[in-house]
Design a protein with these regions (language model features):
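Selected alpha-helical membrane-embedding segments in polytopic membrane proteins
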Residues: 2-96
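Short, hydrophobic-biased amphipathic alpha-helical segments
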Residues: 7-10, 14, 160, 164, ...
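Juxtamembrane transmembrane-helix termini
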Residues: 23, 57, 93, 142-152, ...
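Short alpha-helical linear motifs
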Residues: 35, 62, 124-130, 179-186
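Short, intrinsically disordered/low-complexity patches at protein termini
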Residues: 47, 56-60, 122, 136, ...
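Structural signal for membrane-spanning alpha-helices in multi-pass inner-membrane proteins
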Residues: 47, 51-55, 115-119, 170-174
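Selective recognition of hydrophobic, aromatic-rich stretches within alpha-helical transmembrane segments
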Residues: 61-87, 99, 103-166, 173
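Juxtamembrane boundary at the C-terminal end of a transmembrane helix
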Residues: 169-192
Length: 192
């Protein structure tokens, strides 16, 4: 899968035929490193790179800090959310397997990470990313029974709890960025 065409095919599969894509993903051998280097580190960079363009008018130094901070936080949140998915799985009839949890988490983020290109639009891009995130949650829901082996009736509550955890992690990540001088007050000062 490490080829560029492999990535494009995988993206198309997750976005257009997620049920089939999850079956293929579940069957593939993978490691934490292979998932990060072959998927997460590539796709998670799209939004931060677009941020450099979309927020450049607020100052290059500020937009670089925001982009780098956002990228690091995306990498960390993906890992932490995968740990949460792994720990929660048995409570919903699933089984523990960190690599499967990371596959589910990382590949579910695909739509949201791709929508990160909308960050070139500045603040408006966030709305597009939000809409793509809703689709990402749906792909997680479809993948949960396949990768976590949870029963279909427990996939909805499992997905809802994971989504809430993901939102909480996103808020914490935003607070970290804000604490690092990249919050709304900094933006307002930069725009004046």
């Amino acid at each position: 899968e490490g080829t560029e065409m492999g990535i494009v095919d995988r993206i198309k599969g997750i976005l257009l035929e997620p049920k089939f894509a999850w079956t293929a993903i579940a069957a593939e051998p993978a490691t934490t490193q292979s998932i990060y280097t072959g998927w997460v580190m590539i796709l998670a960079a799209i939004g931060p790179l677009a941020t450099l363009v979309g927020f450049a008018d607020l100052g290059v130094a500020w937009s670089v800090r925001l982009a780098v901070g956002s990228y690091v936080i995306a990498l960390v949140i993906t890992f932490v959310l995968a740990m949460i998915v792994d720990v929660l799985a048995p409570s919903f009839g699933g089984r523990r397997d960190f690599v499967a949890a990371l596959k589910l988490t990382a590949y579910s983020y695909t739509a949201a990470w791709l929508a990160g290109v909308a960050n070139v639009l500045g603040t408006f891009g966030g709305l597009i990313v939000l809409l793509a995130s809703i689709y990402a949650w749906y792909t997680f829901f479809l993948g949960a029974p396949v990768l976590r082996k949870c029963t279909a009736d427990k996939a909805i509550p499992f997905t809802l709890i994971v989504v809430l955890c993901g939102i909480a992690l996103g808020i914490l990540g935003g607070m970290v960025l804000s604490g690092a001088g990249m919050g709304a007050s900094t933006m307002r000062r930069a725009m004046m």
